Swiss-Prot record:
Keywords: Disulfide bond, Ion transport, Metal-binding, Periplasm, Signal, Transport, Zinc, Zinc transport. Residues 114-136 are annotated as: Disordered. It is found in: Periplasm. Disulfide bonds join 253-307. Part of the ATP-binding cassette (ABC) transport system ZnuABC involved in zinc import. Binds zinc with high affinity and specificity and delivers it to the membrane permease for translocation into the cytoplasm. GO terms for biological process: zinc ion transport. GO terms for molecular function: metal ion binding. Pfam families: ZnuA. GO terms for cellular component: periplasmic space. Belongs to the bacterial solute-binding protein 9 family. Residues 1-20 form the signal peptide. Zn(2+) binds at residues 54, 144, 208, 280. It comes from Haemophilus ducreyi (strain 35000HP / ATCC 700724). This is High-affinity zinc uptake system protein ZnuA.
Length: 310
């Protein structure tokens, strides 16, 4: 009887720790959180990597995940507006909204001002029936903060602080994890800076205005972004406009994303005569681990480097 009681209590203890999980809205935030939760508790990700945080619709199972998580980490309604109503119903102490972190807000606000001051007003618009258009960097706040090593470190600090409050018995391990995250990030940032030095003057266009923090952190030469339908081959008018911009600015590469169909990429490649690379903003191929975030940054750096060095 005594042995059974001890076993039951042990099982209950395991269940309690397992339930103290961190749920992040998107995978890149999971990369950051996993570094802090390693050996402490579990990190889970809400959105599938095939989904976009800009237009996702919550399922009933997603609502249950939000309710059962001990800590929910999201950027905020500036990026994931679909989450706002559901998160508003959760206790405030179990929600970490990164938009509200003062240091992160400062980074975002400073970037918005810098983009506004240096915005190129000489850009083209293409108003065909597909609503495809070409633009420089927009004036809205950029909440793709996981591309900022500085903002990501601040996010890690906040996750560590919240987790320590919930699991004080794990304080030492959480602090150890945070220190390791910072050291790994600093080392990786230095490596990427060296790696991209050779391509920092080569211009390129993307199809998603999401990479600004990474571009500024590592000195890349973005010429702007094109907005097109990723599943329908662009029309002649759009292709001509893209070609004109590429020629005018001597762009070396166009960067598509995983949701672009082969037909669209093939059309762009044949019509523009430049290399078409691919960037993965949500790190679909990177597995959650304690070193996942530096691996994610390295994957993005490699994607830039591979296209721009050819």
């Amino acid at each position: 009887m005594f042995k059974k009681t001890v076993l039951t209590l042990a099982m209950l203890g395991v269940t309690t720790v397992a339930n103290a999980d961190v749920l992040t809205s998107i995978k890149p935030l999971g990369f950051i959180a996993n570094a802090i939760t390693d050996g402490v508790t579990e990190t889970k990700v809400l959105l599938p990597v095939t989904a976009s945080p800009h237009d996702y619709s919550l399922k009933p199972s997603d609502i249950e995940k939000l309710k059962s998580a001990q800590l929910v980490v999201w950027v905020g309604d500036g990026l994931e507006a679909f989450l706002e109503k559901s998160i508003d119903k959760l206790p405030k102490e179990k929600v970490l909204r990164l938009e509200d972190v003062p240091g992160i807000k400062m980074i975002v606000d400073a970037t918005k001002k810098k983009d506004h001051d240096h915005h190129d007003h000489d850009h083209d618009h293409d108003h065909d029936h597909d609503h495809e258009h070409i633009h420089g960097h927009h004036h809205d706040k950029d909440w793709h903060i996981w591309f900022s090593p500085e903002a990501s470190q601040l996010a890690a600090e906040q996750i560590a602080e919240r987790l320590t409050a919930q699991l004080p018995e794990k304080k030492a391990k959480i602090a150890e994890n945070l220190a390791a995250f910072k050291a790994n990030l600093a080392d990786k940032s230095n490596e990427i800076t060296q790696q991209l030095q050779a391509v920092k003057d080569k211009g390129y266009y993307t199809f998603h205005d999401a990479y600004g923090y990474f571009e500024r952190a590592y000195g890349l030469n973005s010429l702007g972004s094109f907005t097109i339908n990723p599943t329908i081959a662009p029309g002649a008018k759009t292709l001509n406009a893209i070609k004109e911009n590429i020629a005018a600015h001597k762009a070396q590469c166009l960067f598509a994303e995983p949701q672009f169909t082969p037909k669209v990429i093939d059309s762009l490649s044949k019509s523009t005569a430049v290399k078409v690379g691919q960037l993965d903003p949500l790190g679909a191929k990177v597995k959650l681990s304690k070193t996942a975030y530096p691996q994610f940054l390295q994957a993005i750096a490699d994607e830039f480097s591979q296209c721009l060095t050819q």
